[in-house]
Amino acid sequence: AFHQDGATTLAVGISNVSTTPITVASTAEFLAPGALLIESEIIKYTGVTPTTFTGITRGAYGTTNVAHTAGVAITEVLGVPSATVAAPMPFTATDASYGIELDPINTARVKATVAGVYNFAFSAQFLNYTTVDDNVTVWMKKNGVDIPYSAGVTQVSSKHGSSPGSTIAAWNLVVDMNVNDYIELYFSSTSGDTVCATFPAGTAPVHPISPSLILSATFVSALPA
C-alpha cells in the first residue's frame, strides 16, 4: 500500500502578503514543485530546502491570502495545472510492498516486480474552496496509456462558510501486470480549482492525519497461460 500525506508545521509566522520563503519544521515529506494547505489558504511553491518552501504564490486554487502564526499545521495538496490539463497523482510513502513498488524516479508510477493479476484500490480526498460545485474525474493509466472504462466522475460541493466542500472518491480495478509494467492515477477538475488534499491530525477529538491519497495493490492470481 502507498499513500501521500505530507505534513509539517509553520516555524515562522507570515503576513497576508508575504511571498518570501516559508520556514517550516521540515519539508521532507513534500514534493517539489507543489502546493500546501495552511489553515484555509493554499499556497503554491516551486522549490524546497530542508526547512523552507521557495518560489511562493499566495491564494491559489480559489483561496484567499491570510496571515498565519507560527505553529499552525501545514499539509500537502495536489492540484491540476488548469481546467483543461490533467495531473498524475504521486505517492510519498510506502506502507507495505509485495510484488509492487514505487518507481524511485517517478513516484506517481506503481510498478510490478512480480507478474500477475492485481486488484488496485484507491481513495482520494478532494477539497473545493470555491463558491461553485465542481466535478472531478479520476482514472488509471497502464504504461502511460489510459485504461479503458477506468474513469469515474465525482462531484465536490462548494465551500460552506470558511470550510471547503469535500468528498472522497474510491473504487478499484483489476489489471494484468507483467514485470516492470506500471500504473498511474490521474485526475482532472472541471473548474481547475479542486485539489487532492491531506487533512492534519486532529486534537479535539484526537485523530490521525487523513492522507490525500491511498493506493493498495492485492495479488489476485498468476497471469493466464
Q: Where do the language-model regions lie?
A:
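Beta-strand signatures of extracellular beta-sandwich domains
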Residues: 44, 137-141, 184
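Short, surface-exposed tryptophan/glycine-enriched loops
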Residues: 161-186, 190-191
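Autoprocessing Asn-cyclization modules and mimics
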Residues: 2-78
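Surface-exposed coil/turn segments at beta-strand junctions on protein surfaces, enriched
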Residues: 31, 111-115, 131, 164-166, ...
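Conserved "cap/hinge" positions at secondary-structure junctions
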Residues: 38-40, 122, 187
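A short, structured loop/turn motif at beta-sheet edges
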Residues: 113-115, 141-148, 175-182
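Extracellular repetitive beta-rich solenoid segments
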Residues: 32, 47-48, 58-73, 106, ...
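Terminal (often C-terminal
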Residues: 1-6, 77-132, 142, 150-159, ...
